Amino acid sequence: MLSAARLNRLFLAGELSAVEIAESALSRIAQVEPAVGAFITVAADHVIERAKKLDARRKAGDTELGPLAGVPIAVKDNICTSGMETTCASRILKGYVSPFDATVVERLRAAGAMIIGKANMDEFAMGSSGESSAFGVTRNPWDLERVPGGSSSGSAAAVAAGEAPLALGTDTGGSIRQPAAFTGIVGLKPTYGYVSRYGVVAFASSLDQVGPMGRDVEDVARLFEVIAGPDRRDATNAGRTPPALKFGGEPSLSGVRLGVPKELLGPGIDPGVKARVEEAIAQLEELGATVEECSLPSTEYALSAYYVIAVAEASSNLARFDGVRYGYRAAQAGGLHEMYSKTRGEGFGTEVKRRIMLGTYVLSAGHYDAYYRRAQQVRTLVVRDFERAFERYDALVTPTTPFTAWKIGEKVDDPVSMYLGDICTIPVNLAGLPAVSVPCGFVDGLPVGMQLIGKPFADTQILQIAWAYQKVTKHHEARPALTEEGGR
């Protein structure tokens, strides 16, 4: 699969038709999807129909086809799409078709993109492995016995496996960046409020953000510019448009000051991962950046605070799924309350039920102050740590994850161990900051990601830093050795 930028150029120049591009993507999906499991829905008829319309517009001389015209894209299945199911990878929403498009989907269509399908995910975005989907496990294209990360598991796997050049994911505590790191692609978690959440099924409303995933920084930046911007339908939208990004010339980080939080590059980080990230930091220095060690002392409390705030918001948001208005409804219920109980018990998976119960507990009258209020106080401390760091530094550098992808099933019975894998990404969500994961090497054949964290609304700045790093390295060009049959 060619890059999104190149596909767009070839299509606009008439060297490739949109139908040819769509058919090529569908052929690749047919080859590898049985092994990878990146999609819940493959919208073959839809994408061919869309491609024919784009071809007709180009032949008619339309010069405003858009920066994503002719580009296939996968959309995470918690983002509403009219005409396609939106299941959130849950039995409780199986068969549900939204009557409207999310704002980000509207913008994709306006930019000429071809939505090729809905990507698999952890159920209701609650997970870090891609194993909790009601529609099957997604596998890592680099090692089919390992997880691709989550919760945007299918989005990451689809891009890494060459099924689509771009994908949309959502990130609540690392759900774009962690799978991007595990699968060797680029993933951006934008500043909270930069991208509309209208039409995105909520997990934790104060943490969720939609973002782009792709094989290189230029493609991710192109998609970010399409989806970001004001939206009055989203009360949490910041009403800001990002500055235009221009890549070119010799890569240089002269004058850029980078901080490396000691809490996130010390004990608990796999030695191989640490070595790759330290090599990447040395490369940033060679590009002209000034690098210093810094401290984010409240980081040690971030994980605990997150798993109070996130589950509390989830228990509230998921109360709407009761079997009355839409989605799955349990049969043979003796009354209304039994119908609610059976529907939710049968419709939700284990991880979702675990988080709903925890959220209900921390919001209860006897525990609100001890847990939820205290977690919000810790969140304030995390924000202040970042504010102090950014008084001195332009961006911060950390590993994206403390270890590489684990084997499927390895952590299913130990959710706390899985939660600990988000230690580098969760503080960013608590503070509402932008962060991008870029490939920085391999450990035992498995990809490693470096995370660049920026100031609020400095998304374009961290993308520029990531681009400079990408220009002098080749890690993003590596491809998994999937055969035509989808095996290794």
Swiss-Prot record:
Catalyzed reaction equations: L-glutamyl-tRNA(Gln) + L-glutamine + ATP + H2O = L-glutaminyl-tRNA(Gln) + L-glutamate + ADP + phosphate + H(+)
UniProt keywords, alphabetically: ATP-binding, Ligase, Nucleotide-binding, Protein biosynthesis
Signal peptide: none
GO cellular component: glutamyl-tRNA(Gln) amidotransferase complex
EC numbers on record: 6.3.5.7
First-level EC class: ligase
Entry's Gene Ontology BP terms: translation
Active site per database record: K76, S151, S175
GO molecular function: ATP binding; glutaminyl-tRNA synthase (glutamine-hydrolyzing) activity
Gene3D superfamilies in UniProt: Amidase signature (AS) domain (3.90.1300.10)
Pfam families given in the database record: Amidase (PF01425)
HAMAP family hit by this protein: GatA
Function: Allows the formation of correctly charged Gln-tRNA(Gln) through the transamidation of misacylated Glu-tRNA(Gln) in organisms which lack glutaminyl-tRNA synthetase. The reaction takes place in the presence of glutamine and ATP through an activated gamma-phospho-Glu-tRNA(Gln).
Subunit structure: Heterotrimer of A, B and C subunits.
Protein family (similarity comment): Belongs to the amidase family. GatA subfamily.
Name of protein: Glutamyl-tRNA(Gln) amidotransferase subunit A
Organism: Symbiobacterium thermophilum (strain DSM 24528 / JCM 14929 / IAM 14863 / T)
Gene that produces this protein: gatA
